[in-house]
Every structure is written in structure tokens, then in C-alpha cells.
Amino acid sequence: MKQILFNSLKNEEVFSVLIKWKNNLYYTGYYYDEDGNDYLFNDLENIKCFKTFDELVSFCGQNNLLLNKDVSKYDFDIMLTNPIDYSDALNKWNILNTISLNLNIVFEGNENKYTEVYNYLFSCNFAIEQLPPLYKIPNKYFKLIISVFNNQNEVLDKLLYSNDNI
């Protein structure tokens, strides 16, 4: 794997990510650049993953990065149901988008036909009147969300299995 370059790193603070998929755990980190864009630890071809949180901590120490100890968790082994945890669905959608952008691959959720459902999930998170954590959404939106997550494997395969980064 090529050396990870932290181009335009806004500061030395990075954030930890835990992805659970196919009963395996993968840790990585992300950071923001000066323009507010977020990047996973990558070398433009692969995203650097670690088997344990301690390995992530060690990597950050070796690279003089301040690791925020809060861990963003994404469990892709949990099947979506309706009523849906709209916050979890939106967060998973966003991390899949970030992975795809970092690896320059297609993520189905970025297609125009999904803009309306993404905006709906986003509005549930920031509704004026707070919604319950599990919220029954219209079936037309739920079917589109399921379609996006049924096609997540290509993005996760590229992240976790297409290289020797673990």
C-alpha cells in the first residue's frame, strides 16, 4: 500500500470509524480538509483499515495525528426494517458515499432517482418536531432505501476485500 498523504489536513485531529460487515470489524479514520470535505485514510487506491482500535491508535501516533476517541459505528449486518432508524440509515448512506468518493467508484445512492429519499431521511433527522428514533416512513421511500442498501456490497467489497490493507 502506498503511503497515506494527508493533503490539506485542516488540523491534526482525526476521527475514528468502526464498520461491521459480515461479522467482521474494521477500523479506519477520517479527517476534514480546509474546505470541509471529509476523507477516509486512503492513498487514492485503497482505504487503510485496521483490525483493532489499538492499531488505529498506534497508526495515528506514528503520524502525529490527534485521534478523537469517539467512534462512529456503522453496522451493515443489521437489516433495515420499517419503522426505520432514520438517523442510522442516513449515517450509513453518508459513509457509503464517502467510501465511494474516496475510492472513485459508483455508489447507487448518488443517482438522481434517490435524491428525494435522501432528502426525506435528512429532513427526518432535522425535523422541527423531534421524531421518535424508530419512525414509520412511506413504503415508496422505504423500498428505495432498501434498494440502495441491497447494492452496498460493491462499495464495501472495494473497501474491505479488494486490497491487502488488513
Predicted regions and their residues:
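Acidic-enriched, low-complexity/disordered segments with a strong bias for Aspartate over Glutamate
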Residues: D33-D38, D43, D54, D70, ...
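ADP-ribosyltransferase catalytic core
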Residues: F59-T98
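Short N-terminal edge-element motif at the start of the domain
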Residues: M1-L67
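Generic structural signal of hydrophobic/aromatic residues within well-ordered alpha-helices
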Residues: M1, L5, L56, C60, ...
